[in-house]
């Protein structure tokens, strides 16, 4: 019997993985110092240092505002050195925003993954233009799992200055971790967190989950499973007439081109998924706890509605 509550609209639908839940339960025993001066935050910080093979790491939580976003042209969801130059060199007058930081998403919003050499090429371009490189790693774990690369190889060793390491989509309840690979960029960061209302008094309950996720490589195990389920779905629907894969499956998302009647029929059958990627486009996301049987049920329904 499969869990009928499992859906494919978002990897945020899933709950908390057992490793994270266990760490939070342990952190709930006794008293600890507040505002990040606790043993769990120290352990999490040290775990990040080990994982990324560096001593320059940050702490959980980040918030910023007031920035002007300039959207770059992409290829399969990925920014290129050429598209960065197009924006950075477009205008130099005071009436145009002055670019300061390039942000790339790993894995991207369409499920593609930047290779180390692609990140390095972007980093080299950023240095040439006097820009910093920030990586939005909401699904960073999935990228590592797909490529078989270490976190260091996909971040600072490839030229990333700051990484936002996501945990929410990989078994945590809340929380992202900010890792600074250039110590100078982290100066006064604690003050900015405080000013932005991001300094939790009981920080251990944001830090302990990271200990549970990082120790014994639970983060990698869960992201591998989510990726596997996405690959399985892709394989199961690959021979269905009329179904087209919109983007290569490299992380935990599958983007399919379906007929509009099929999209409506799937929705009528109770399946939840997003259709923001164009007419007939559908996104199906797999999670750390997605059941293979549920993937097969979805694939079977896609086959039925496409043949109707």
Residue ranges of predicted features:
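Conserved PLP-enzyme active-site core in the AAT-like
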Residues: 2-269, 275-290, 298-306
């Amino acid at each position: 019997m499969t869990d009928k509550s499992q859906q494919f609209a978002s990897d945020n639908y899933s709950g908390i993985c057992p490793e994270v839940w266990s760490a939070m339960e342990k952190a709930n025993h006794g008293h600890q110092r507040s505002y990040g001066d606790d043993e769990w935050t120290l352990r999490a910080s040290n775990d990040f240092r080990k994982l990324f093979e560096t001593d320059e790491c940050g702490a959980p939580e980040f918030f910023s505002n007031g920035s002007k976003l300039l959207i770059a042209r992409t290829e399969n969801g990925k920014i290129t050195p050429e598209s960065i130059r197009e924006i950075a060199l477009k205008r130099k007058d005071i009436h145009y925003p002055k670019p300061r930081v390039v942000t790339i998403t790993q894995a991207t919003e369409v499920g593609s993954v930047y290779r180390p050499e692609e990140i390095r090429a972007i980093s080299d371009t950023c240095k040439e233009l006097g820009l910093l490189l920030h990586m939005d790693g909401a699904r960073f774990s999935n990228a590592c799992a797909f490529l078989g690369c270490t976190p260091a190889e996909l971040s600072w060793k490839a030229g990333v200055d700051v990484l936002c390491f996501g945990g929410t989509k990989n078994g945590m309840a809340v929380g992202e971790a900010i890792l600074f690979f250039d110590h100078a960029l982290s100066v006064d960061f604690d003050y900015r967190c405080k000013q932005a209302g991001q300094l939790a008094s009981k920080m251990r309950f944001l830090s302990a989950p990271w200990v549970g996720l990082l120790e014994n490589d639970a983060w990698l195990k869960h992201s591998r499973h989510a990726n596997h389920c996405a690959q399985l779905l892709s394989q199961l629907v690959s021979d269905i007439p009329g179904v087209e894969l919109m983007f290569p499956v490299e992380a935990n998302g599958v983007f399919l081109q379906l007929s509009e009647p099929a999209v409506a029929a799937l929705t009528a059958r109770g399946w939840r998924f997003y259709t923001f990627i164009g007419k007939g486009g559908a996104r199906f996301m797999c999670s750390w706890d997605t059941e293979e049987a549920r993937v097969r049920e979805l694939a079977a329904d896609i086959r039925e509605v496409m043949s109707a």
